[in-house]
C-alpha cells in the first residue's frame, strides 16, 4: 500500500472520529486533509502505478465500474480513498449518494454544476424537471472540491487532458440521499443503478427485430408505447429512436406517446433530441 495514502486516510479517520463521524463534517475534513498535503505535489504517479501493479498488499478493490480504472488506495469501514483515471473527455451529469472531497492529481477539467428545478417524480427511479446550469470553473492540477450527497450537488466534469487523475476521499454511502440520479438534459433524471430485467430484455429483443429487418418493427414499438407507463415508454423510445427515424416511422410513434401522456410528454421530446445529438 502507498504510504502517502495510508497517512492521509489515518488523518481523515482521526479527525472524523473526533466529531463522532458527523456526515455533515466529512466533506470539510476531507478537503482540509487534501489541502494540507496536496497529492499533486506529494505523489509520483508513475511510481504509484508501477507499485500497484507489483505489490499484492493493496486495499480491497471495488467493482464500482467508476473510473478508467478506479484504484482503491485506502479502505476503512466508514470511508475510502480512490484514484480515478479518466481517458474519455466527459462524465455524465450526476449526483452522489456519498460525500467527501476530490482533488485533481493530474490533468485539468472543466467542472460544471447544475440544479434540477420544478421536480415531478414519476417513479422512485425516474423524475422530470428542469436542469439548469448554475456555474462552470476550470479545475487545474492541485485543485480540491468538496462533494455533498444528494440533489444539492449535481455536476459533470469534462477532462481536458488524457489521462486526468482525481483523488477522491469519500464515504461508502450516506443513508437517505439516494437514488444517485444521472441527469439527461434538459428534463429527465434516472436512477442508473435501478435494474428492470424485463425491460432490458425487451429492448434487447427490439434490437434483434431492428437488425434483422422485421417489417413490423415500428408497429410493435408503437403497440408497446401505447400500453407502457411513462418511464418504460421513455426508455423504449430512447432505445428505438434512431432506428425509427431511419425507417421514417418516428413521428407516428412519437404521436402515440404524446397522446397517451399529454402535457408530460413535453418533457421527453427535447430530452430525446439531446440524447441523439450527443
Residue ranges of predicted features:
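A short glycine-rich, His/Asp/Glu-containing loop-to-beta-strand
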Residues: 67-87
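Conserved short histidine dyad/triad with adjacent acidic residue
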Residues: 81-95, 148-150
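Short beta-strand His + acidic residue motifs that chelate non-heme Fe in jelly-roll/DSBH
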Residues: 92-93, 111-112, 135-138, 147, ...
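Glycine- and acidic-residue-biased ligand/ion/polar-headgroup-sensing regions
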Residues: 98-117
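A short hydrophobic beta-strand segment most commonly corresponding to one strand
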Residues: 101-103, 155-156, 161-177
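Short acidic-glycine-tyrosine-enriched beta hairpin
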Residues: 103, 116-149
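Charged, amphipathic alpha-helical linkers/stalks
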Residues: 167, 171-219
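Intrinsically disordered terminal extensions flanking catalytic oxygenase cores
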Residues: 209-278
Amino acid at each position: 500500500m502507498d504510504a502517502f495514502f495510508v497517512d492521509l486516510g489515518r488523518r481523515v479517520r482521526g479527525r472524523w472520529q473526533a466529531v463522532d463521524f458527523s456526515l455533515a463534517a466529512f466533506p470539510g475534513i476531507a478537503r482540509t486533509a487534501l489541502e494540507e498535503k496536496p497529492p499533486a505535489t506529494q505523489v509520483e504517479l508513475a511510481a504509484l502505478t508501477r507499485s500497484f501493479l507489483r505489490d499484492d498488499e493493496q486495499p480491497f478493490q471495488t467493482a464500482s465500474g467508476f473510473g478508467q480504472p478506479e484504484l482503491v488506495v485506502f479502505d476503512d469501514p466508514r470511508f475510502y480513498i480512490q484514484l480515478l483515471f479518466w481517458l474519455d473527455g466527459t462524465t455524465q451529469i450526476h449526483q452522489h449518494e456519498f460525500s467527501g472531497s476530490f482533488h485533481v492529481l493530474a490533468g485539468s477539467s472543466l467542472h460544471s454544476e447544475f440544479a434540477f428545478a420544478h421536480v415531478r417524480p414519476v417513479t422512485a427511479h425516474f423524475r422530470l424537471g428542469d436542469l439548469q446550469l448554475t456555474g462552470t470553473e476550470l479545475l487545474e492540477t492541485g485543485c480540491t472540491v468538496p462533494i455533498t450527497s444528494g440533489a444539492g450537488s449535481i455536476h459533470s466534469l469534462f477532462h481536458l487532458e488524457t489521462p486526468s487523475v482525481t483523488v477522491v476521499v469519500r464515504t461508502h454511502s450516506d443513508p437517505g440521499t439516494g437514488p444517485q440520479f444521472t441527469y439527461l438534459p434538459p428534463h429527465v433524471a434516472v436512477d442508473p443503478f435501478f435494474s428492470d430485467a424485463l425491460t432490458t430484455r425487451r429492448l434487447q429483443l427490439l434490437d434483434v427485430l431492428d437488425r434483422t429487418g422485421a417489417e413490423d418493427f415500428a408497429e410493435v414499438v408503437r403497440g408497446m408505447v401505447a400500453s407502457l407507463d411513462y418511464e418504460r415508454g421513455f426508455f423504449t423510445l430512447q432505445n428505438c429512436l434512431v432506428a425509427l427515424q431511419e425507417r421514417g416511422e418516428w413521428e407516428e410513434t412519437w404521436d402515440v406517446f404524446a397522446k397517451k401522456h399529454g402535457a408530460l410528454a413535453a418533457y421527453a421530446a427535447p430530452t430525446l433530441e439531446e440524447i441523439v445529438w450527443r
